[in-house]
């Protein structure tokens, strides 16, 4: 997946969000001087707090052979059933555990329970679990797909914590603070309501999951016309944030029967993509439904339904309507505006 195809939340009205959005929309690259002068601080409950420039840390980490390049997922906490706020990309970064070791390691304090990621504009200070940091699943990322980050993806750097929702993946972060006040990472309701940690899914008013696990078909507009008698492939993904996907199921009869596919040992740090190929046998409308299960037994709380129309004769180009505006309401013409003004 290319960087420009990654989802991002630059609709937030934060200082650096506005700068990133403006640069992205104007196709203006971020200045290299921002990377060259970007400070990273590691402090809090460590033995030797320090501040170092990002390029110096990169050079030192690369020389030490500790940088990591790997494929990793990012799935928005808000990502609903049928939505596409997901990314699967190659990241290159410095393990946060190495950055802490560079600070002399953790201080002798039994109450240490997390690492806060401090965003440079002060708008976020979410905490990561120690097991993610110590387990080599938290990174200071400075490249995606072998290239420096785009403006929308947080140039010059972003935090990246694997196997959790990306609300802790603060863009343009400048400080890792080892703390004793991190939340209970098993209390997803508290994390959700207090904007801390990793809720790992969206919850309703009763604290129930609404999008975990999530089984989604992508790129099929409602009522898509397909050729009868010819195979058609539905493409999509299944994910459950911090839980492994165990199976995915498909139904063509509105849930009366399900065809189950066991997935074996999946990687919680990567998206599970699928292709479901099916051949209609007669001209008609058809609906596909899908759901997923996790290792712990969670079942998709919401089920996506996509409808296609199988036709023996596909419509010609002049028999179709092409909507060339993203708006649901057609834009006014100059003549229409003049006519309205005369009323």
Which residues fall in each region the model found?
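Surface-exposed, glycine/proline- and aromatic-rich loop segments on solvent-exposed faces
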Residues: 41-43, 50-72
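Acidic/histidine-rich, surface-exposed loop or edge segments in extracytoplasmic proteins
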Residues: 38, 67-82
């Amino acid at each position: 997946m290319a960087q420009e195809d990654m989802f991002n939340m630059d609709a937030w009205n934060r200082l650096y969000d506005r700068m990133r959005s403006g640069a992205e929309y104007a196709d203006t690259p971020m200045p290299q001087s921002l990377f060259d002068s970007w400070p990273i601080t590691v402090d809090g409950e460590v033995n030797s707090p320090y501040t170092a420039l990002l390029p110096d840390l990169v050079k030192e980490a690369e020389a030490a052979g500790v940088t990591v390049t790997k494929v990793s997922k990012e799935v928005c906490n808000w990502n609903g059933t049928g939505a596409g706020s997901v990314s699967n990309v190659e990241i290159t970064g410095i393990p946060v555990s190495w950055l802490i070791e560079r600070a002399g390691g953790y201080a002798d304090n039994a109450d240490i329970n997390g690492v806060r990621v401090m965003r440079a504009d002060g708008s976020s200070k979410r905490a990561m679990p120690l097991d993610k940091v110590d387990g080599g699943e938290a990174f200071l990322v400075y490249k995606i797909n072998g290239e420096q980050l785009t403006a929308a993806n947080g140039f010059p750097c972003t935090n990246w914590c694997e196997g959790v929702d990306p609300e802790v993946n603060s863009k343009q972060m400048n400080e890792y603070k080892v703390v004793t006040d991190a939340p209970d990472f098993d209390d997803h309701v508290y994390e959700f309501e207090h904007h801390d940690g990793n809720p790992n899914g969206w919850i309703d008013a009763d604290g129930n999951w609404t999008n975990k696990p999530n089984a989604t078909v992508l790129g099929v507009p409602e009522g898509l016309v397909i050729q009868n008698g010819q195979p058609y492939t539905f493409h999509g993904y299944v994910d459950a944030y911090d839980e492994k996907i165990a199976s995915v199921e498909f139904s063509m009869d509105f849930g009366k029967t399900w065809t189950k596919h066991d997935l074996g040992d999946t990687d919680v740090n990567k998206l599970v993509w699928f292709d479901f190929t099916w051949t209609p046998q007669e001209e008609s409308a058809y609906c596909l439904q899908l759901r997923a299960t996790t290792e712990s037994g969670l079942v998709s709380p919401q089920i996506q339904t996509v409808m296609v129309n199988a036709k023996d004769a596909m419509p010609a180009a002049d028999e179709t309507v092409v909507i060339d505006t993203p708006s649901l309401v057609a834009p006014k013409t100059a003549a229409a505006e003049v006519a309205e003004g005369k009323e």
